[in-house]
Design a protein with these regions (language model features):
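Flexible, acidic/Gly-rich N-terminal and inter-domain linker regions that tether
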Residues: 1-89
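Conserved Radical SAM active-site core
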Residues: 57-94, 101-209, 214-218
Length: 219
C-alpha cells in the first residue's frame, strides 16, 4: 500500500513515486496558521486538502510529524497465508512513536516511501476519519461481524492518540454493532477508555493484551 491508497480523493498524481518529500525542489506548501502545511505541485499526491502535514512544538510531540489523511478503507483483511489467529485488523495510525527497535512493522513504512528507521518512529500517518469510516464498513451488508484485532501493526494507544482521540469513536462503533474485537497495547492511555471497553464487553467479546517492555521498575 502506498500513499495514494490512504486517501479518498487522490486524483492529482500520475504514480505513487510522486509521493516525494514535500520539501523537495518542485514542491510548495501553504501554511494555515496552525503549524500545518498542505503540499501542492508534484508533492500533492492526494488532491486538494486530502493530506495535512502537521508538527506540534510541545514536549510530548517534539520531533514527531503527523500526516493527517482521510483513508479510503479501515478494516484490513490479513493475507490467507498468514499464521495470525485473526483475519481482520484495524490500524488507525501508521508508524509508532513507541520506537521499539524490534518492531516487525517497520518495513511497512517503506510502502509509503517513508524511512523504516527513525521515520517509522517520527513520521506518523493519522487516519482522521477512522471512526466514521469504521461505522460505514461495519454497516455494509457484506460484513459478517467477524472478530477485529487492533494494535497488531502499530500501537493504537501511542502518543498520537492523546491528541487525535480516534479510539473512543472506534470502540463505540464496534459496541454499537456488538462486533467482537481485541486490543494489543503497551500504552497506559487505554485506561482512559476503560468505561467504553466495559460497555462494549457487555454486548460482545472484548479482550485486551499488554506488551511489557521491561520488568525493571526503575527503568
Amino acid at each position: 500500500m502506498r500513499w495514494d491508497s490512504l486517501t479518498d480523493d487522490a486524483n492529482t498524481a500520475d504514480s505513487p513515486d510522486e509521493a516525494a518529500d514535500a520539501d523537495g525542489p518542485d514542491a510548495t506548501a501553504t501554511a494555515d496558521g496552525t503549524g500545518a502545511t498542505r503540499a501542492t505541485g508534484p508533492a500533492a499526491l492526494f488532491g486538494a486538502g486530502a493530506v495535512t502535514t502537521r508538527t506540534i512544538d510541545t514536549p510530548e510531540f517534539r520531533g514527531i510529524t503527523f500526516h493527517e489523511v482521510r483513508a479510503r478503507s479501515l478494516v484490513n483483511r490479513v493475507p490467507g497465508a498468514s499464521r495470525m489467529p485473526f483475519e481482520w485488523t484495524v490500524n488507525p495510525y501508521r508508524g509508532c512513536s513507541h520506537a521499539c527497535v524490534y518492531c516487525f512493522a517497520r518495513r511497512t513504512h517503506a510502502y509509503l516511501d517513508l524511512d523504516t528507521g527513525l521515520g517509522f518512529d517520527s513520521q506518523i500517518v493519522v487516519k482522521t476519519n477512522a471512526p466514521e469510516l469504521l461505522r460505514r464498513e461495519l454497516a455494509a451488508p457484506r460484513w459478517t461481524g467477524a472478530h477485529i484485532a487492533m494494535g497488531t501493526n502499530v500501537d493504537c494507544y501511542q502518543r498520537a492518540e492523546g491528541r487525535y482521540r480516534l479510539m473512543p469513536g472506534i470502540i463505540e462503533a464496534l459496541r454499537e454493532r456488538a462486533n467482537p474485537f481485541s486490543i494489543l497495547t503497551k500504552g497506559t492511555m487505554i485506561l482512559r477508555d476503560l468505561d467504553l471497553l466495559t460497555e462494549a464487553a457487555g454486548v460482545t467479546e472484548v479482550s485486551t493484551a499488554f506488551s511489557i517492555g521491561t520488568l525493571d521498575e526503575d527503568a
